[in-house]
């Protein structure tokens, strides 16, 4: 089914998923908060490994942590999804969009497994850490691209 701009609904869904995938790389994939004796500290890390935050926690983790997220892969797949949705022919496009979506979801699965979640309190100190919202948006973007591929395949077979 086409629209005024020449793109079908499946292509628009995959294009939107690719754009959301690119944006998600710059959102927090990991976040942590700690407080002790009324002093709070926080840290967040995006898909490209850029660390931001404040307080003691930032200083401790900036030196010792290695961030091996697959953000570049998700970024590249988002760009490829946009190119595939805009440039390829129908049958190849539908399969390529679906594969890109599955690979983006795979990037989410690899990263969600590598992030440990913790929440605890001891005396007057507390700490919470886990996956940031950007990582869940990666899964949404992958689902959008894969759904666009499935819709495109359905349109081709009709």
Protein language model features and the residues they cover:
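Compact integral membrane and secretory-pathway proteins
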Residues: 1-158
């Amino acid at each position: 089914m086409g629209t005024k701009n020449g793109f079908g609904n499946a292509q628009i869904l995959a294009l939107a998923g690719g754009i959301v995938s690119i944006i998600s790389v710059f959102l927090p994939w990991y976040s942590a908060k700690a407080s002790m004796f009324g002093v709070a500290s926080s840290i967040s890390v995006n898909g490209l490994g850029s660390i931001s935050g404040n307080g003691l926690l930032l200083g401790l983790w900036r030196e010792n942590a290695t961030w091996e997220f697959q953000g570049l892969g998700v970024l590249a797949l988002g760009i490829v999804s946009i190119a595939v949705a805009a440039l390829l022919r129908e049958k190849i496009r539908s399969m390529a969009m679906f594969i890109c979506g599955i690979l983006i979801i795979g990037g989410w699965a690899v990263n969600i497994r590598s992030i440990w979640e913790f929440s605890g309190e001891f005396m007057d100190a507390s700490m919470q850490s886990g996956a940031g919202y950007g990582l869940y948006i990666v899964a949404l973007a992958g689902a959008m691209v894969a759904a666009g591929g499935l819709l495109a395949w359905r349109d081709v077979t009709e």
